[in-house]
From Swiss-Prot:
PANTHER family registered for this protein in UniProt: CHLOROPLAST 50S RIBOSOMAL PROTEIN L22-RELATED, LARGE RIBOSOMAL SUBUNIT PROTEIN UL22M
Oligomer and partners: Part of the 50S ribosomal subunit.
GO function term, MF aspect, one: structural constituent of ribosome
GO biological process, one term: translation
Family listed: Belongs to the universal ribosomal protein uL22 family.
Disulfides per UniProt: none
Highest rank taxon of the organism: Bacteria
GO cellular component: cytosolic large ribosomal subunit
Protein name, as recorded: Large ribosomal subunit protein uL22
Length: 111
């Protein structure tokens, strides 16, 4: 059985969030939560909350055994990009891109 959770519009670069997502992909959920709890990256907290939501969805909606769940998929996709202006020398300006991410976590029960 598969269950998923989605977090959209996270104000963080997808490239930075993927560094944390790669740590927990394919891990049992208990180990994945421990890894995220002790990871010092900013992306660890929203990914952990999304994983906890996927675990709760599996437990409450599907009746899955939490100890048998594995992080089957974790995808970090790019969201909307906010374009901002930064003043530069000699009256010029440059563009700052404020990137956002969409996180999708899929947990599956292994037998």
């Amino acid at each position: 059985m598969k269950s998923s959770a989605v977090l959209k519009g996270l104000q963080m670069s997808p490239q930075k969030a993927r560094l944390v997502a790669d740590l927990v992909r394919g891990q049992p959920v208990g180990k994945a939560l421990e890894i995220l709890r002790f990871t010092t990256k900013k992306a660890a907290l929203p990914i952990r909350k999304c994983l906890e939501s996927a675990i709760a969805n599996a437990e409450n909606n599907e009746g899955a055994d939490v100890d048998a769940l594995v992080v089957e998929q974790i995808m970090i996709d790019g969201g909307a990009v906010l374009k901002r202006f930064a003043a530069r020398a000699k009256g010029r300006g440059s563009r700052i891109l404020k990137r956002t991410s969409h996180i999708t976590v899929v947990v599956a029960e292994v037998y």
